[in-house]
Curated annotation (Swiss-Prot):
Pfam families named among the record's database cross-references: Adenine_deam_C (PF13382), Amidohydro_1 (PF01979)
Gene that this sequence comes from: ade
Organism: Cereibacter sphaeroides (strain ATCC 17029 / ATH 2.4.9)
Protein name (database record): Adenine deaminase
UniProt keyword annotations, A-Z: Hydrolase, Manganese
Keyword Manganese tagged: yes
Catalytic activity: adenine + H2O + H(+) = hypoxanthine + NH4(+)
Family the UniProt entry places it in: Belongs to the metallo-dependent hydrolases superfamily. Adenine deaminase family.
UniProt cofactor(s): Mn(2+)
Entry's Gene Ontology BP terms: adenine catabolic process
Class in the EC hierarchy, top level: hydrolase
GO molecular function: adenine deaminase activity
Amino acid sequence: MSRSLSECIDQGRGLVPADLVLKHGRVFDLVTGELVQTDVAICGDRIVGTFGTYAGRREIDCRGRILVPGFIDTHLHVESSLVTPFEFDRCVTPRGITTAICDPHEIANVCGLEGIRYFLEASAHLVMDLRVQLSSCVPSTHMETAGAALEAKDLAPLMDHPRVIGLAEFMNFPGVLMKDPGCMAKLEAFRGRHIDGHAPLLRGKDLNGYIAAGIRTEHEATTADEALEKLRKGMRVLIREGSVSKDLHALVSILTERHAPYLCLCTDDRNPLDIAEHGHIDHMIRTAIRLGAPPLAVYRAASLSAAEAFGLKDRGLIAPGRRADIAVLDSLEGCHAALVLAGGVVADDAAFSARSDVEPVARASVKVAEIAPEAFRCPGNRAETPVIGILPGKIITEHLTAEIEPVDGDKRPDPARDLARIAVIERHGKTGGRATGFVRGFGMARGAIASTVCHDHHNLAVVGIDYADMALAANRLRALEGGFAVAAGGEILAELALPVGGLMSLRPFEEVRDALVTLREAARSLGVTLEEPFLQLAFLALPVIPHLKITDRGMVDVDRFEILP
């Protein structure tokens, strides 16, 4: 909905009525920190007039409201919302999120470039502005079996796509430091372009080396001290609050007006139930202000600083010439959007209904033979056994050990000690490999849960106490083309089909949200105490997050970057 330069000038000068005028509201000026009573004139997709009175062909009364720039989620995986980009758009844009920068590496790990192209094509049809970073680590390491592998030469044809913003989170930070040839080829190919980072707990000179590779932004800081070191060394820090990784409380002390130009907000992984119950970037804004962060710092991080960090110079302020991304709020503290404009378009049912669709990809992606209960045995001769220790609200895990005596050659789950079986089974039709181990922290007393959302290789992951229930849940996902399942006593208690790559539903986000409520209740009936058991399970298989993880190839000591014998 662009207009000619002449039209923009004339409407900005007030010589002719503007296409749209937001009347009588107060604009939160992110440069001066002032709240200013003014009309906002819009021509096509651009703001053309502020700090004055305007007439418009269409006028909306914003009396008693505060206007702020639309919010920017600077790092997320849309697939973690469990819906397609179209439903994600409908779910979060009305909350004020007008730009999102996504890394589609979940779908890319299942079907490669086809998945990235799907996101690029879909992004052209949304109400929000969805930008795509090219997935840097498919697979994330050599210690897993993904459905695809992407090298620098594979990404090169998409580098100059108008909706691409550089290279996505470079998770294989050990590969960067060890100058792995594949990592070096990607870093060289994107030299001078935006490269997003991923370096949990990396400090000192190793962090210097990682940043020197050209990496500019990073979202894995979990303490204020870690975040400050990254800021001091020139990184833009993206404060994260996802459904599992919740770092806002730990980092809110650095969210000051002094630091805000170098801080952004992101959600990384957030599902529709969490969005419905709490919110998205709007939830982060409310929470940060409630915890004492200055509103000016918070709103800068949510828009202006984010735009500048990722080179989106046309947005982030309510000012002439900027993209008309505007959230009309009840208050700065409440951050509830009464009206949202994305590129001058009101984000309402009519706008969402007017979008054209794109055929989804990666159907029938669960390629695994029927699984027998015996597949979940954990053989071993020694009693001393590595155990993944869950830290609620974190994707970092503990590397624990427990004495588990084998019985008939099998180390069995022990719910009395909160020791559940965990298994990962290759599901891309490549090796048929599987690995079993132990996890502590679910609180599970019976039954099993299974998922094909299993970062980042997205193999089939199962946690349980009873092998027969584990097999039942896993086999149910074969029939559903992937998803989530809860089983106990030989019955499926709850399920959610995710047929798009085993990652995303084809249903409206409201139905997915309701299914997650049922799944959560079913998991609790097994004794599970985690708020988000399926997302927590998904991250137990990611071998670039310390300290102990599991993939289809075995238990992974992330600190030593090797598979345990």
